[in-house]
């Protein structure tokens, strides 16, 4: 009994110690409105976690375009005016940090212990190998991998034109993940075994993916924590650098980064964890984004017609003979403005990343309105462009409606002029983040999604099992984690177009 009493007293002291900073914190002059919530230390964490979008809508209506909220003992200052994003993203005073925050996150999620300079190394490797000639080579590898995944090792089979049924999300995610994995991490001489391994990794990845949001928020139960640990260990083994000698065709991008880590003395076991991190970064969003692109095309026949007409005009009539693989003139990916607009509109509606910057020293932020806000050292400045940019009706009229030509000028060129309150705005969409946290692989990600959509509209017949099926809603549990996922899948039928 004495022991339990001592433990209870100790627990009360610990809880009190955790809650004390939140209880004592008060709003200082020039600081944004402070909303600590009614629960000590937790603050608004549970409401935020339940539906981030609705929570931020409520806070903005209550406090305006800038406010600070308490979430699990940490204070986040949300800036909701996109015209005021510039000073935060450029950070000329070097008082806002992203790298240290990211290091803590990747250590928790992937087990990777960052070293000095590796954030810069990733961006340099991406500039060299995911743009220009490097991107051309990777696009070729991706086309080969898509052919392998979608057609099999022998190319088009005699019964390839029979109908298949699947969930569209499962289909898109599976194809994009497996093809992307093989393109980046390499393959062996046994193509069938490569496909089996890619399928195994995809199944495990999807399980980790389902647990991911609650894992990041530390909301897993004991059994789920153990499962996450097992999955992490499994990925470290499956992606181990010890398997590299067995593989051909590892991308120069991955090879460049692993060579750097080796030269810096990073142990092979830590390189395995780096590979897991890069698998997530490269494959966690392209499949879901491809799903949204195809479901919008299926639900908007005028958009589907426009994409097909453009594809035929640029690529010609497709023809896939028996035992052939897909052939696409990859340079055409730079000359398809209609599909570019479709993808940009898809990402506007379906990509919802959160941008974080940790305040290193007190800083005065001047808003576009002229208001000056004092940001406190240790707080986290947060941008959520989905709400403040993508869904702003001033920037994008009818923001919840899919318009395939939203990003096209009347002459068919790309539209880049968007306005808020009559002022031209630089950040009119932000699906890839921005500034130091912009996605370094965005050009390859966009290329592989465009390539997949082109293959689907050119070589396949694709239809909804139920033509009246609506576009499914977004799963609110994933707000803030890159490309969103649907609450449920949608059944489709697909087949290779018959040979004439």
UniProtKB/Swiss-Prot annotation:
Keywords (A to Z) from UniProt: Endoplasmic reticulum, Heme, Iron, Lipid biosynthesis, Lipid metabolism, Membrane, Metal-binding, Microsome, Monooxygenase, Oxidoreductase, Phosphoprotein, Steroid biosynthesis, Stress response, Transmembrane, Transmembrane helix
One GO MF term: iron ion binding
Protein name in UniProt: 7-alpha-hydroxycholest-4-en-3-one 12-alpha-hydroxylase
Species name: Oryctolagus cuniculus
Residues reported to bind heme: 439
Cofactor: heme
Primary location group: endoplasmic reticulum
Pathway note: Lipid metabolism; bile acid biosynthesis
